[in-house]
Amino acid sequence: MKNFFKKINRIFQDYMREKRLKIGKAIWDKKEKTNIIKGNNFIENNNIKSILFLRYDGKIGDMIVNSLMFREIKKVYPDIKIGLVARGAAIDIVKDNPNVDEIYEYHKDRKKIKELALKIKEEKYDLLIDFSEMLRVNQMMLINLCGARFNLGLDRNNWSLFDLSVESDKDFKWGEHITKRYLAYLLKLGLKSEEINLSYDIYIKDNSKYTEFLNKIKESKRLVLNPYGASKHKSFSIDTLENIITFLKDKDIAIILVYFGDKFKELETLEKKYTNVYIPKSITNILDTALLIRESDFVISPDTSIVHIASTFNKNIIAVYPPNGGKFGVDHLVWAPNSDYTKVIFCKDKSSSYDEIDINTFELEEMEAEILKMINNSD
């Protein structure tokens, strides 16, 4: 009966979403077309002096990967102004990035979105870039009201609001790594493929915050173990953590547990129980976690944002992902770790389409075997 009501609610929500999007598109899918001067280089041919990136989803991992675009544009065109719409913890990832000139904080409140758009419109951006696979009504409104000279989006050839479009299955493939999609955007702008570096950037100003903490670690190697994913179903349980910790207790590897908010409280018993477990008591933002990862050797995580941070610093990674590539069958490819040494382990599938996966249902024996391979790879 519970699954029946879930099914009915999902059908209703999908129906209403489709209606809202149609109405929103009818209202906001409008733009006076700007003449595009065609050639081999959109930026130069159309005198692009400023670019606004829209990253209003608040996803940390996406922002990390997006950093390659900021850097590569600035590398060729250092005088171009790069603005960025962002929200939440994703702002922390780019707040010290020298390739971003201005950050605009996004709030979901409709009134604040309009105020933000009017502020941006005064800046008269030449080009707006949106990465959304599905545009919600508030996002359509934001793009419309920003008033950029050109708008570039994803699969938007049938939209009046967009002047340019990166096309899936033509400019990139859905099953390719996310960096290939961002490469397609850069090529659309006229950058040369052979000159583009697809690595990520994270800039950390305070490099000494954990010096004392790290100096107390007696083991010769350090492994960052991140328990947390996007939901409780995608987070490691205490039992899972203990299994990994116990397996590593005689391997001369320190385990650094990372967390957010008040999650420290549910982990501190592990530090008291195991001599190879260390928990810093002052993780206040994602850059703190990034610093700990940078100063470690290995990373194990069920969360893609941590995986992307580890990839930035080319750390050896074991990631635990849902089976079958997630909802669309390609997540494990699109969001794969990007270090020299990586391994993705899959948990078991959910029992029905209305249940949640449990990330803890991976095979422990497989995890142990992969940990040994990862450790040996670093010797």
For the regions a language model picked out, list residue spans one by one.
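Catalytic machinery of carbohydrate-active enzymes
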Residues: 1-379
